[in-house]
Amino acid sequence: MSVILGSDLVKRGMAQMQKGGVIMDVVNAEQARIAEAAGAVAVMALERVPSDIRAAGGVARMANPRIVKEVMEAVSIPVMAKARIGHITEARVLEAMGVDYIDESEVLTPADEEFHLLKSEYTVPFVCGCRDLGEALRRIGEGASMLRTKGEPGTGNIVEAVRHMRKVNSQVRKVVNMSTDELMTEAKILGAPFELLLQIKQLGKLPVVNFAAGGVATPADAALMMELGADGVFVGSGIFKAENPEKFARAIVQATTHYQDYDLIARLSEELGEPMRGLEISKLSVQDRMQERGW
């Protein structure tokens, strides 16, 4: 069988290679090297971590290409970068730069409130956020090769990531237990392609990996998300907004790998210093909830 560059098989295979690992947000080469040394399987290059984007307000855009290049030159692990929802040119620029993945991200200010990118038209694989199975399958239908929970980025509060992971997994179980003749109606309810629901029923799971993201701030948070069925973990502000980023990075990687070794997680957590300061989700207005962006 010939393998075509940019095909779903290749792009999904690249995402599978990150399974079980931690992907860390970084804003410069020094942070990227810390992440790689700690055992991160990939880094996300951006100008500001989500907590700083939230604090600054205004319009958040794709990172300056200089920052992305600096990170790409600093590490040997895959480098991801974020593009705004629906921003074709930002995505094409990142693809031309040679990033390993593009995150069509609700952390940035959406460029298009009606249309997401048609990710199947790109050679580079995409990761997208989701809150439920309908969102997940719409993004896969557009060509996403990897999913992540939206959570609530930049808050250090894991509750929304937990909600989204549990929601997706419970809906997957429901589909798996349906008879085939019920799937078309479920596709209508979810607003998702019938063919993807059929794949889920046949596979017994999503056809792509689904990582946890949005609110991971401690080793225990990372382990919890793995316990709930995540294929891996994204950590945004939780590393470099912590008191000791190097220790936090190493501890979160180990906790993700050994997520059911509770004695180890306790030891890892003993002398880390203070984690990032957290935000209570209920105090955020609807317009300040990044998870509401996209559909």
UniProtKB/Swiss-Prot annotation:
Binding site for D-glyceraldehyde 3-phosphate: R166
Molecular function terms from GO: pyridoxal 5'-phosphate synthase (glutamine hydrolysing) activity
EC number: 4.3.3.6
GO biological process terms held by the UniProt record: amino acid metabolic process; pyridoxal phosphate biosynthetic process; pyridoxine biosynthetic process
Top-level taxonomic group: Bacteria
CDD domains recorded: pdxS
List of residues binding D-ribose 5-phosphate: D25, G154, G215, G236, S237
Pathway field: Cofactor biosynthesis; pyridoxal 5'-phosphate biosynthesis
Keywords: Lyase, Pyridoxal phosphate, Schiff base
Pfam families listed in its UniProt record: SOR_SNZ
UniProt keyword ATP-binding, yes or no: no
Active site per database record: K82 (schiff-base intermediate with d-ribose 5-phosphate)
Catalytic activity field: aldehydo-D-ribose 5-phosphate + D-glyceraldehyde 3-phosphate + L-glutamine = pyridoxal 5'-phosphate + L-glutamate + phosphate + 3 H2O + H(+)
Enzyme class: lyase
Quaternary structure and partners: In the presence of PdxT, forms a dodecamer of heterodimers.
Function description: Catalyzes the formation of pyridoxal 5'-phosphate from ribose 5-phosphate (RBP), glyceraldehyde 3-phosphate (G3P) and ammonia. The ammonia is provided by the PdxT subunit. Can also use ribulose 5-phosphate and dihydroxyacetone phosphate as substrates, resulting from enzyme-catalyzed isomerization of RBP and G3P, respectively.
HAMAP family given in the database record: PdxS
PANTHER family xref list: PYRIDOXAL 5'-PHOSPHATE SYNTHASE SUBUNIT SNZ1-RELATED
Family: Belongs to the PdxS/SNZ family.
Name of the protein in its database record: Pyridoxal 5'-phosphate synthase subunit PdxS
Gene source species: Haemophilus ducreyi (strain 35000HP / ATCC 700724)
Gene name of this polypeptide: pdxS
